[in-house]
From Swiss-Prot:
The RNAP catalytic core consists of 2 alpha, 1 beta, 1 beta' and 1 omega subunit. When a sigma factor is associated with the core the holoenzyme is formed, which can initiate transcription. The keyword Nucleotidyltransferase applies. HAMAP family: RNApol_bact_RpoB (MF_01321). Keywords: DNA-directed RNA polymerase, Nucleotidyltransferase, Transcription, Transferase. Its EC number is 2.7.7.6. GO terms for biological process: DNA-templated transcription. Belongs to the RNA polymerase beta chain family. This is DNA-directed RNA polymerase subunit beta. It comes from Halorhodospira halophila (strain DSM 244 / SL1) (Ectothiorhodospira halophila (strain DSM 244 / SL1)). It catalyses: RNA(n) + a ribonucleoside 5'-triphosphate = RNA(n+1) + diphosphate.
Length: 1381
């Protein structure tokens, strides 16, 4: 593999032993592909997939017919326009990034008499705005970035289950079947303790299941024949009964008479018939057996028995034979009857008992019964009952299994075909509908006599009979993923259905009044549904933007909650647990702690959803024991059929599995298998974990609970001022940084033309440009913008002018990335030792050096907004002329009343001056006089300026002013506008300049050395054009030269034309952008002006901040110790962090210790390289040392491909330490770490003697020291510390509010009162309960006394006493307080 431009500057040593078969796929593919499939905007209109996305939704609702059938609205196609604003503009203006959706419809009017088409009108209808996905898989809604989380829900289909013996006291298992459609009514079948089968529709009251079958048109006979085998008896004269013998059916029965065959008695009366007896009977070839008459008693007749003479029914189907009935059959001369074959073992009489419990006698009665159950209290009519039943399961408008549901359904009931109708199909029912229904005829032709409902019942009875298995609903073959596209499509369809109802009403008017399609369709419901989904659905979440990793994990999250999913309260233990099918699909580690544990999961690294929405994961194919590089994706359903080896199974040189027995997975169990049985093999050891977990080095040495915390805490790391790559990584860092979208990658290869802190200009290589376009890519970098979590998002260039970059190379770093690698924290020199009790309970001790060097300083950006509204009393005004405010308070404002950029402000400072008109009150004569003298301003406004909130100080880094259309812009707004326009102009000018330079360079190549006919500045006929001549001539006059070769003249003309059109294009683009900038802003109603001020706040590390490693080893900083007091090593290097050694053994996260050792070795090797560079070692010596470091074990590097300069740069970058990658489950082992420590000249034990910085004495035993990668988490003490003197009070109780957000007080609760009582501190207690809490009069007196310098207090009546009195009175008990005074 060739190194990319940034990779070769700092090569990470990879300790992985296993080959890299499959690169990590694009991490945001699930989101991006799903939405692309939904919009299909890059696909031409006729090539779109008609089953999915917007196209699918439109086609499922259209065409819409009027009630009379004379008018029809047909859908033709849709198109998505261009978004009016770019993503960044939407974010700053608080808009939704969306594009207009327009639908082309055709209105057809039919002629009643003639039967032809009378009139057709086509028109495009605006259907509202469709939110677009940004390139990184997010949506911008009202200016904030949001993510739509994938949902894991129960797949549609049929499921068989039992109640685990909970319903009945005997513990009997009651089986049930449930048909779950994608949309429509649920259908449940269940057994009761008496083994009758009941049906429920939509979980309503249960009815015997045969009612449903009768409603479908089945007669009792048909029902019985569908579910039972029958025995045939011949009745002869003299009450002789002969049975057509099927020997297997006798097995297990006790013979009530001697069974005789071929003259010998095979089974004696009273003996049980065994398998041996059955074999003997089969051998003897007996086909009929004479049985005694009473053998019939208790058998159930399978059909109606009719007297041949009179036509009278002697016995109905499902009648149990008694001696009397049997006799009547003999008397009537019936020759043959069939009875149901049932036994206690594996042929239960369930359907028969159900039929006996069913009181209905006909199809109509059954329909009425179902109608009564669904619509209790409504009088049933024939039509209503038939209609209701038909719409429940048999119309595609109301019921849809979806392709997934149909596939799952068919496979579960044992059919081979995965396709089928979206409704429940029953041949008998559709045949009964008659020829009126065209759709029914098509279905009957296609699917014949099959019946979905009968198949489900058969399977259910089979399971009850002990022949089948119930389903595991937590199996990932029974749960599927719904992504953005699918959810948006469902919402869109719901909106369209609402539109359809309105259109149906108006279509009848269209005939009479000649309306156009636009007047028929009101798109508001669609727009409202979409807006509601993206803005406030439970699964549309505010993006977690702490750092690049948290963005990626948020987009790969899979939630079982949300609409149509589970709820926290209802979810049991099984749903949350790790399931064997999670392997390679869902991460077993990364999930939140707390109430959501196991309900919110993360996609595994190689997992993806297939076309049905089931998660599948990658495997290598194994053929006859030889491992191939062919990769196949298997879903959980397919996987259980195969034998799958693990990624670390030993493979010899020729690719054959090396061991005799190999650890494998088969049918969700771990087993050992021989090499020839293995069919697949994992592609990578990190296949089973998610992105966040795969970033934890030595994960295999950590306990699962701590690994979970480690994976979760990496997402909370705050980007530091200077990112520092981890010395010990896992090799995933570059992938995550690239796919997160925070780094700028080259879209096309080329040469860097220009770089500054704000943008990078690349001149694209000729082979990557299309003809006629300027071969220039301009990358604007984002500087100091606020993320969703108020952290700072800023990019800085990595390239220099003249660098050659290829497509996909990193051009600029973003937050928490270092040279294109994810860098969430800093490498710290740590020692595991106690230090004066400051390590108690996982506290962490740090050196002052970290604060001094700003290692963990982070910048947080706060956005403060000031809104000037139009009020009843007049409009608010943003101004620097504020009443009763000192000059010094206004010193940071400009003439418009807005703070300068760069001003350092602290709590309480004015950022935007604003005055609001006050209500008119009755003026005194003096005030009238003052107003007459000083004008209006004196008293009629109050100061409502935007001030810096408490506990915040920082620097103003940006100000934005938004002005309503039609309101005059102030000076500040105009200045901001001018800057913006200048910036756009500069970008376009640069692009144009590079394009022109390029064109003239091509012209020069074309003209120099060719013969001219004539030209300006005395170029004669036949003269040769020289370079010097062209340099003297102004460029625009080059086109006046006439050449002898006509082809060259044509090329000259073509270039001139190209330049002109390009200039026009640039000018047009500039005008467009300028218009956007100068236009007024679309503000919410009543708002005249909005000013947004961004403050940058620097947060240094301080005691109380949360600090953590990557192994779940978290703690709070307890103290910052001067550098000179920290323990130091032999060479005088003080350690930077002291961790508690007790944090390791009980937590079992040994990974942190291994990381510390390897980090120390990595740093030591960097030190050695640094020394070699100082001694100016030659290239060969450096190459030799590097190959010793890189190539002794693990993956080999191609250092020989580097040039000398590249080698020097690499060594220079390695001085701070040689970065190592120890992939998850395939990392460095103890021997390799020791080798590195030895190579770096460090003790192989990883321990060294430390000396106390205060006394200089050596500690009494060697201490583990090394480099650990540590993160500062976004739980900063600055956001939590809070104090109050006076502040707001609660309205009813008059007690201070609680919490920092309300500027509340500290609660002095029940227990604290007990403490004071125990001390007997009566006066302190009184003060706490009265003046410091809810004694209103006492509070005001106290304030007055303090002002007067008198420090006494008088306690009055606490307000809570009055509240208590009122509460007692509300119970109807009068209570009065009698005062002595």
């Amino acid at each position: 593999m060739a190194y990319s431009f940034t990779e070769k500057k700092r090569i990470r040593k990879d300790f992985g032993k296993l080959p890299n078969i499959l690169d990590v796929p694009y991490l945001l593919a699930t989101q991006v592909d799903s939405y692309r499939q939904f919009l299909q905007d890059e696909v031409s209109e006729d090539a779109r997939d008609t089953e999915v996305g917007l196209e699918g939704a439109f086609r499922s609702v259209f065409p819409i017919q009027s009630h009379s059938g004379n008018a029809e609205l047909q859908y033709v196609s849709y198109r998505i326009g261009d978004p009016p604003f770019e993503v960044k503009e939407c974010q700053s203006r608080g808009l939704t990034y969306a594009a207009p959706l327009r639908m082309l419809v055709r209105l057809a009017l039919y002629d009643k008499e003639g039967g032809g088409v009378k009139d057709i009108k086509e028109q495009e209808v605006y259907m509202g705005e469709m939110p677009l996905m940004t390139s990184t898989g997010t949506f911008v809604v009202n200016g904030t970035e949001r993510v739509i989380v994938n949902q894991l829900h129960r797949s549609p289909g049929v499921f068989f289950d039992h109640d685990k013996g909970k319903s009945h006291s005997s513990g009997k298992l009651l089986f049930s079947a449930r048909v779950i459609p994608y949309r429509g009514s649920w259908l449940d079948f269940e057994f009761d303790p008496k083994d009758t089968i009941y049906v429920r529709i939509d979980r309503r009251r249960k009815l015997p299941a045969t009612i449903l079958l009768r409603a479908l048109g089945y007669t009792p006979e048909e029902i019985l024949y569908a579910f039972f085998d029958t025995d045939r008896f011949h009745l002869g004269s003299g009450n002789k009964v002969v049975l057509d013998l099927v020997p297997e059916r006798l097995r297990g029965e006790t013979a009530s008479f001697d069974i005789v065959a071929g003259g010998e008695t095979i089974v004696e009366a009273g003996r049980r018939v065994t398998a041996r007896h059955v074999k003997q009977l089969q051998k003897s070839g007996v086909e009929q057996l004479e049985v005694p008459e009473d053998y019939l008693t208790g058998k159930i007749i399978a059909h109606d028995v009719i007297d041949p003479a009179t036509g009278e029914i002697l016995a109905e189907a499902n009648t149990t034979l008694t001696p009397e009935i049997t006799q009547s059959l003999f008397d009537a001369g019936i020759r043959e009857i069939e009875t149901l074959f049932v036994n206690d073992l594996d042929r239960g009489p369930y359907m028969s008992t159900t039929l006996a419990a069913d009181a209905t006698r006909s199809q109509m009665e059954a329909l009425v019964e179902i109608y009564r159950m669904m619509r209790p209290g409504e009088p049933p009519t024939k039509d209503a009952a038939e209609n209701l039943f038909h719409t429940l399961f048999f119309t595609s408008d109301r019921y849809d299994l979806s392709p997934v549901g149909r596939m799952k359904f068919n496979l579960r009931v044992g059919r081979d075909e995965v396709r089928g109708p979206g409704i429940l199909y029953d041949g008998k029912y559709f045949a009964g509908l008659g020829n009126a229904d065209k759709e029914a005829d098509d279905l009957i032709e296609q699917y014949g006599e099959s019946s979905d409902i009968l198949d489900v019942l058969r399977e259910l009875i089979d399971i009850r009979n002990g022949n089948g298995q119930v389903d595991d609903i937590d199996h990932l073959g029974n749960r599927r993923v719904r992504s953005v596209g699918e959810m948006a499509e469902n919402v869109f369809r719901v909106g369209l259905v609402r539109v359809e109802r309105a259109v149906k009403e108006r279509l009848s008017l269209a005939e009479s009044e000649g309306l156009m399609p636009q007047e028929l369709i009101n798109a508001k419901p669609v727009a409202a549904a979409i807006k509601e989904f993206f803005g406030s659905s439970q699964l549309s979440q505010f993006m977690d933007q702490n750092n690049p990793l948290s963005e990626v994990t948020h987009k790969r999250r899979i939630s079982a909650l949300g609409p149509g999913g589970l709820t926290r309260e209802r979810a049991g233990f099984e749903v949350r647990d790790v399931h064997p099918t999670h392997y390679g699909r869902v991460c077993p580690i990364e999930t939140p702690e707390g109430p959501n544990i196991g309900l919110i999961n993360s996609l595994a690294v190689y997992a993806r959803a297939n076309r049905y929405g089931f998660l599948e994961t990658a495997y290598r194919k194994v053929v006859d024991g030889q491992v191939t590089d062919q990769v196949e994706y298997l879903s959980a359903i397919e996987e259980s059929r195969y034998v799958i080896a693990q990624a670390n199974a030993r493979v010899d040189e020729s690719g054959y599995l090396a061991d005799d027995l190999i650890s494998c997975r088969h049918q969700n169990e771990f087993t050992m298998a021989t090499a020839d049985r293995v069919q697949y093999m994992d592609v990578s050891p990190r296949q089973i974990v998610s992105v966040a977990a795969s970033l934890v080095p030595f994960l295999e040495h950590d306990d699962a609970n701590r690994a979970l915390m480690g994976a979760n805490m990496q997402r909370q790391a705050v980007p530091t001022l200077r990112a520092d790559k981890p010395l010990v990584g896992t090799g995933m860092e570059r992938t995550v940084a690239r796919d997160s979208g925070v780094i700028v990658t080259a879209e096309r290869g080329g040469v860097v033309e220009q770089v500054d802190s704000g943008r990078i200009v690349v001149r694209v290589d000729d082979e990557e440009t299309t003809p006629g376009e300027p071969g220039v890519d301009i990358y604007s970098l984002t500087k100091y913008t606020r993320s969703n979590q108020n952290t700072c998002f800023s990019q800085k260039p990595l390239v220099h002018v003249g660098d050659r970059v290829a497509r996909g190379d990193a051009l600029a770093d973003g937050p928490s990335t270092d040279m294109g690698e994810l860098a969430l924290g800093q490498n710290m020199l740590v020692a595991f030792m106690p230090w004066n009790g400051y390590n108690f309970e996982d506290s962490i001790l740090i050196s002052e050096k970290l604060v001094k060097e700003d290692r963990y300083t982070s910048v947080h950006i706060e956005e403060l907004t000031c809104v000037a509204r139009d009020t009843k009393l007049g409009s608010e005004e943003i101004t620097s002329d504020i009443p009763n405010v000192s000059e010094s308070a206004l010193s940071r404002l400009d003439e418009s009343g807005i703070v300068y950029i760069g001003a350092e402000v602290k709590a309480g400072d004015i950022l935007v001056g604003k005055v609001t008109p006050k209500g008119e009150t009755q003026l005194t004569p003096e005030e009238k006089l003052l107003r007459a003298i000083f004008g209006e301003k004196a008293s009629d406004v109050k100061d409502t300026s935007l001030r810096v909130p408490t506990g915040m100080d920082g620097t103003v880094i940006d100000v934005q002013v938004f002005t309503r259309d039609g309101v005059e812009k102030d000076e500040r707004a105009r200045a901001i506008e001018r800057e913006e326009i200048a910036r756009v102009r500069k970008d376009l000018d640069d692009e144009a300049r590079i394009f022109e330079d390029d064109a003239y360079a091509r012209l020069e190549k074309l003209l120099v050395g060719k013969v001219a006919e004539g030209g300006p500045k005395g170029l004669g006929s036949g003269a040769e054009v020289t370079e010097a001549y062209l340099q003297d001539l102004p460029r625009e006059r080059w086109f006046e030269i006439r050449m002898r070769d006509e082809a060259v003249n044509q090329q000259l003309e073509a270039v001139r034309h190209q330049l002109e059109t390009q200039r026009d294009r640039f000018e047009r683009r500039f005008q467009e952008k300028k218009e956007k900038i100068t236009a007024g802003d679309d503000l919410s109603p009543g708002v005249l002006k909005t000013v947004k001020v961004h403050l940058a706040v620097k947060r240094r590390l301080q005691p109380g901040d949360k600090f953590a490693g990557r192994h779940g080893n978290k703690g709070v900083i307890s103290m910052i110790v001067p550098e000179e007091d920290m323990p130091y090593m032999d060479d005088g290097t003080p350690v930077e962090v002291v961790l508690s050694p007790l944090g390791v053994p009980s937590r079992m996260n040994v990974g942190q210790v291994l990381e510390t050792h390897l980090g120390w070795a990595a740093r030591g090797l960097g030190h050695q390289i640094g020394q070699m560079l100082e001694q100016q070692a030659d290239a060969e010596a450096l190459r030799g040392y590097l190959s010793e470091i890189y190539d002794a074990s693990g993956r080999k590097e191609e250092l020989e491909t580097l040039s000398e300069e590249e080698l020097q740069e690499l060594c220079h970058n390695l001085k701070g330490g040689v970065p190592a990658a120890t992939p998850v489950f395939d990392g460095a082992n103890e021997g390799e770490i020791k080798r590195w420590l030895k190579l770096a000249g460090l003790p192989e034990s990883g321990q060294t003697t430390l000396y106390d910085g205060r006394t200089g004495d050596a500690f009494d035993r060697p201490i583990t020291v090394g480099y650990m990668y540590m993160l500062k988490l976004n739980h900063l003490v600055d956001d939590k510390v809070h104090a109050r003197a006076t502040g707001p009070y609660s309205l009813v109780t008059q007690q201070p509010l609680g919490g920092k957000a309300q500027f509340g007080g500290q609660r002095f609760g029940e227990m604290e009162v007990w403490a004071l009582e125990a001390y007997g501190a009566a006066y302190t207690l009184q003060e706490m309960l009265t003046v410091k809490s809810d004694d209103v009069s006492g509070r005001t007196k106290m304030y007055k006394n303090i002002v007067d310098g008198d420090h006494r207090m008088e306690a009055g009546m606490p307000e809570s006493f009055n509240v208590l009195v009122k509460e007692i009175r509300s119970l109807g008990i009068n209570i009065e307080l009698e005062r002595d005074d």
